[in-house]
């Protein structure tokens, strides 16, 4: 999928979130990169866990007025890894949505066990 099309699907996933969540993530940037740093491109036929996305920042449950200024909170989606675990465009769309929701869950302070229920 071309980067522009991938970004459009990410935007659609964000737009599909309920307003009560969208209003709380206005300051969270969602970025798209090919791969995580230091990862070689995924190879066909080599099953392994691939990092699909990552939240960078401080969860809302841990923020304090005493925190030192940092860069903005953001989510990075790794396009090549998402595409590698999907077979069709429909699967890519669904995986983007699931990954966006998962990483934003970390922004809201949810851990991996809590996110399994989402």
List where the protein language model places each region.
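Short alpha-helical catalytic segment bearing the HExxH-like zincin motif
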Residues: 95-103
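Active-site rim/adjacent substrate-binding subdomains
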Residues: 1-95, 107, 111-116
């Amino acid at each position: 999928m071309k980067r522009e099309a991938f970004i459009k699907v990410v935007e659609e996933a964000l737009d599909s979130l309920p307003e009560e969540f969208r209003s709380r993530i206005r300051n969270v940037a969602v970025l798209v990169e090919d791969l995580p740093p230091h990862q070689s491109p995924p190879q066909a036929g080599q099953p392994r866990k691939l990092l699909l996305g990552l939240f960078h920042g401080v969860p809302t449950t841990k923020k304090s007025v005493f925190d030192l200024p940092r860069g903005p909170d953001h989510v990075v989606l790794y396009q090549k890894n998402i595409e590698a675990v999907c077979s069709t465009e429909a699967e890519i769309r669904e995986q983007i949505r699931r990954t966006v929701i998962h990483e934003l869950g970390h922004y809201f302070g949810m851990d991996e066990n809590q996110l399994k229920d989402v």
